[in-house]
Amino acid sequence: MLTRFLGPRYRQLARNWVPTASLWGAVGAVGLVWATDWRLILDWVPYINGKFKKDD
């Protein structure tokens, strides 16, 4: 839908920048997880969530 409004030059530029933008997005996500509490993020992962059982 967006390609209908973009010209061929901008479509090619967007196609070239998608891998770079996705890589930087992944680096940013890993950096965000690293900067925050790992356990808070990993509680949402089902396999790892079982390793952090609380002793009640």
From Swiss-Prot:
This is Cytochrome b-c1 complex subunit 10. Belongs to the UQCR11/QCR10 family. The keyword S-adenosyl-L-methionine does not apply. The chain crosses the membrane at residues 13-35. PANTHER family: CYTOCHROME B-C1 COMPLEX SUBUNIT 10 (PTHR15420:SF2), UBIQUINOL-CYTOCHROME C REDUCTASE COMPLEX 6.4 KD PROTEIN (PTHR15420). Component of the ubiquinol-cytochrome c oxidoreductase (cytochrome b-c1 complex, complex III, CIII), a multisubunit enzyme composed of 11 subunits. The complex is composed of 3 respiratory subunits cytochrome b, cytochrome c1 and Rieske protein UQCRFS1, 2 core protein subunits UQCRC1/QCR1 and UQCRC2/QCR2, and 6 low-molecular weight protein subunits UQCRH/QCR6, UQCRB/QCR7, UQCRQ/QCR8, UQCR10/QCR9, UQCR11/QCR10 and subunit 9, the cleavage product of Rieske protein UQCRFS1. Component of the ubiquinol-cytochrome c oxidoreductase, a multisubunit transmembrane complex that is part of the mitochondrial electron transport chain which drives oxidative phosphorylation. Residues 1-12 are mitochondrial matrix. GO terms for cellular component: mitochondrial inner membrane; respiratory chain complex III. It is a single-pass membrane protein. InterPro entries: Single_a-helix_sf, UQCR. It is found in: Mitochondrion inner membrane. Residues 36-56 are mitochondrial intermembrane. Pfam families: UCR_6-4kD. Keywords: Electron transport, Membrane, Mitochondrion, Mitochondrion inner membrane, Respiratory chain, Transmembrane, Transmembrane helix, Transport. It comes from Bos taurus. One of its GO terms (biological process) is mitochondrial electron transport, ubiquinol to cytochrome c. Its main location: mitochondrion.
